[in-house]
């Protein structure tokens, strides 16, 4: 039950962000959005290294000099999986004027919802893999580091929920429907987390591949979505500073508590 509640934390971030439509007339400030994106990116990069790639390699030590192979394969499968989704699904990233994927007549807001949903899939899977590794007794993955990852993703999801719900409200939707639209964009996260957790427990020998798959998918999201978000608009170092803060927090927890 405790694991399930922790898996729901990222979804809570989306829900709270979507609720901004009830008490805010303007979106979150640029500096706030950059800070949150930078912090989340730092957490995810550190998790990719210490929580996923290094444990994946260590669990494959019986392969000798080829112990890197499961991590290498899993990482590339994760990257290619996200690249494939990016090509197949029409979507529009925050702050971008050019839609990606196949041509579509979908509205701008709908494609923004799809962009958020698209990248929520690997985030949910990453959380599921993290808790699967912890429950499997992986010494490199602690309850604290898994919780920090959930919190880091929740922090990143907060502005995304607002980014979806507030434009829907501006287009004439009721506050309730706008809130629901933001919430629905994050529903795939707990679903993906639970399914991945169950799958990983059924195929423990495949855990190194699943861990590195999560790393590849998350690194793709960081480079494709979070780095542009923390760098857009007027020049500021705030995103970079919070990236370092997020990275340091996750690294410290992983190493100190691992």
What is the meaning of each model-derived region?
Residues 1-258:
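Intrinsically disordered, metal-sensing/regulatory segments
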């Amino acid at each position: 039950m405790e694991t399930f509640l922790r898996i729901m934390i990222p979804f809570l971030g989306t829900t709270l962000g979507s609720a901004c439509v009830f008490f805010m007339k303007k979106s979150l400030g640029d500096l706030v959005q950059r800070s949150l994106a930078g912090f989340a990116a730092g957490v995810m990069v550190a998790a990719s290294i210490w929580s996923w790639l290094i444990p994946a390699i260590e669990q494959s030590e019986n392969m000798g000099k080829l112990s890197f192979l499961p991590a290498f394969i899993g990482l590339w499968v994760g990257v290619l999986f996200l690249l494939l989704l990016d090509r197949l699904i029409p979507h529009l990233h925050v702050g971008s004027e050019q839609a990606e994927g196949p041509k579509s007549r979908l509205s701008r807001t709908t494609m923004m919802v799809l962009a958020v949903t698209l990248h929520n899939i690997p985030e949910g899977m990453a959380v599921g893999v993290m808790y699967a590794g912890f429950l499997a007794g992986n010494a490199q993955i602690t309850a604290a580091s898994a919780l920090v990852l959930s919190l880091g993703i929740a922090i990143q999801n907060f502005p995304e929920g607002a980014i979806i719900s507030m434009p829907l409200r501006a287009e004439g939707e009721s506050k309730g429907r706008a809130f629901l639209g933001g919430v629905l964009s994050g529903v795939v996260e707990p679903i993906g987390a639970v399914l991945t957790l169950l799958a990983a427990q059924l195929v423990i020998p495949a855990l190194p591949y699943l861990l590195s798959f999560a790393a590849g998918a998350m690194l793709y999201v960081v480079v494709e979505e979070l780095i542009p978000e923390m760098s857009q608009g007027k020049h500021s170092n705030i995103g970079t500073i919070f990236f370092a803060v997020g990275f340091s927090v996750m690294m410290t927890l992983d190493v100190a508590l691992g």
